[in-house]
Swiss-Prot record:
PANTHER family: FORMAMIDOPYRIMIDINE-DNA GLYCOSYLASE. The lineage of its organism: Bacteria, Pseudomonadati, Pseudomonadota, Betaproteobacteria, Burkholderiales. HAMAP family: Fapy_DNA_glycosyl (MF_00103). It catalyses: Hydrolysis of DNA containing ring-opened 7-methylguanine residues, releasing 2,6-diamino-4-hydroxy-5-(N-methyl)formamidopyrimidine; 2'-deoxyribonucleotide-(2'-deoxyribose 5'-phosphate)-2'-deoxyribonucleotide-DNA = a 3'-end 2'-deoxyribonucleotide-(2,3-dehydro-2,3-deoxyribose 5'-phosphate)-DNA + a 5'-end 5'-phospho-2'-deoxyribonucleoside-DNA + H(+). Pfam families: Fapy_DNA_glyco (PF01149), H2TH (PF06831), zf-FPG_IleRS (PF06827). This is Formamidopyrimidine-DNA glycosylase. Coiled coil: none annotated. Binds 1 zinc ion per subunit. It comes from Burkholderia mallei (strain ATCC 23344).
Amino acid sequence: MPELPEVEVTRRGIEPFVAGRRVERVDVRTAMLRWPVPAGFAEMLRSREVLRVERRGKYLLFEVDAGWFIVHLGMTGTLRVLPNDAPPPAPAKHDHVDWIFDEFVLRFRDPRRFGAVLWHPRDAGDVHAHPLLASLGVEPFSAALLFGRTRGRTVSVKQALLAGDIVVGVGNIYASESLFRAGIRPTTAAGRVSLPRYERLADAVRATLADAIERGGSTLRDFVGSNGESGYFQLDCFVYDRAGEPCRVCGAPIRQIVQGQRSTYFCPNCQR
């Protein structure tokens, strides 16, 4: 699943192309995604200028004068910028939505169709009040926020990172990597982690996400950036998907456990 770095990599790749450009038309080939593409979506965007593209958690928010169209990549989604040749490149089976500009096509592909393309009209208020965005955690977050919101919670610190209401956009890969960098065992109860340790964790999360963005995200199966290139952060992971391999720091075998139906990787020596 694309996590925050992959979504930010996509945003940075797309915005220079679309900001200040008008959508000539929209082709919706598959309306039944995770939620249905709104009726009349293509007509609402015809000849609209894209003002900017921002990210909130794992959502991409494309602002036009009449509102915002919101894109979520789901489990397997990608947004790619393709040259608008004559004719435009033919869509494949899982290419569900095209935004046609004068010189290029922005194409949404999603084999599993867990992604979404939604519309938030300006007269409905600020887009950040949209039901899918309003409950997301704070960006950027702080150690004090982590510490305060986890008091009394018995859930593991890794599961707290994944919950989305405290820290937004940190998925399974980056939670495991951040906990390793902070030296915190993922099974530790979130409410028992001290403020100094949360300070290390907050720094580790920020550094891990920044490194992942710089490396184009992680490509484990489907993700490619807007230019079609794979990310390579996964090649430098300390613990993720390295069960049984030696720790890059101490040499101890990396362990794998399951938490909340997701695989967790950690070093039993470096993480306490």
